[in-house]
Amino acid sequence: MKEPPKLPDKFPMFESVTYTQQSTQGPTDIVEGYYEGDVKSAHDEVKAELEGAAFTILFDELEEHDSEVSWKGQGRSGQVALREECGDSDRTFVHITNRPE
């Protein structure tokens, strides 16, 4: 991806995530990419980094093949959805939404 992701200014840039595309649907910015690692590792990193950047965690859920972390901060809210890539437990699909609160 050539341009920086459309995320809040203080939103953490997860070291293990490669961002591949972004789009806007109405008021919602969507950023996608992948994490080199399993869903649990991705979930733990995302949650810890968001909390460390002073974002509020509204909800989080970790299951065997997917995870969600809903957040708010800096006048925005959204969700980081993590899904195991089909047939590859060492690569996790990342889907981040963010919109005005």
Regions flagged by a language model, labelled:
Residues 1-101:
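An acidic-aromatic pocket/loop used at catalytic or ligand-binding sites
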